[in-house]
Amino acid sequence: MPRGQASKRRAREKRRQARGEDQCLGGAQATAAEKEKLPSSSSPACQSPPQSFPNAGIPQESQRASYPSSPASAVSLTSSDEGAKGQKGESPNSFHGPSSSESTGRDLLNTKTGELVQFLLNKYIRKEPITREAMLKVINRKYKQHFPEILRRSTENVEVVFGLYLKEMDPSRQSYVLVGKLDFPNQGSLSDGGGFPLSGLLMVLLSTIFMHGNRATEEEMWECLNALGMYKGRKHFIYGEPQELVTKDLVREGYLEYQQVPSSDPPRYEFLWGPRARAETSKMKVLEFVAKLNDTVASTYKSRYEEALREEEEQARARAVARDSARARASRSFQP
């Protein structure tokens, strides 16, 4: 490409990125927003759904995709669930009327978190090491004092949603690498085919189903997927076509059930836990996952917590009956 054309292309890209950051900052001027003080680690994550990458290939560094600053935005809690309130009657991730500067600072923190998440995933796809120096360069050195909080949010995102965690490889060089974190005991085939474990995404989907009363409508599931940057008919650069994934692949694996709502006319569809999900995880584990996303404890969600406890008690009784039955059979087999 001639030098002049390349220069113009870079200029257009910079203008496009500036417009995107302006939108993320709620219409404020990017130059003014950059001067705002970033919020403390106690600030809640924004809940606005992100945009997916422009194409299905490996995203380029210049493609500023927006990731949710916390996967909590993907788990849509039912408003009728009285347990979704904190001890003071508030949602665990609610907050009281932030000032304009606080809101702008929080949006900027979310933007920087999204940029770092994109960078980490690029490195994982390319199987390249990650250095602290490179991460600082991505977020801009002027935010060095906020790097620990941005890194914490970013690593939480990739751990929960993508099933990856950041492992230190060389302390002297401050070099790291993303590695898979397997949460399901029998998930050898639970992968997107490109090396990304699906356990994190699956936990988000199972959480959505459980928090909606053990069955989630197709609309509720797509609201969840949209919050993760996954849209119907649009190929995701990691997971491929989302509809194929949730209605066929995960159903075939036994993790989800996809069925028509009884007596619905016109037909409507819903998602339930599949037999493999029921065998490999539990309502309590999923509820603890939801609580972790919202920086609270499982008992905060009273009705769901009681339901999860009942399931644990029933499973404990079933195991006790099975053990007693096995002992009785063994005893009879040794009788003359």
Curated annotation (Swiss-Prot):
Biased composition (Polar residues): 90-103
Region (Disordered) residue spans: 1-108
Highest taxon listed in the record's lineage: Eukaryota
Pfam families, per database record: MAGE (PF01454), MAGE_N (PF12440)
UniProt feature, compositional bias: Low complexity: 39-54, 62-80
Protein name according to UniProt: Melanoma-associated antigen B17
GO cellular component, one term: nucleus
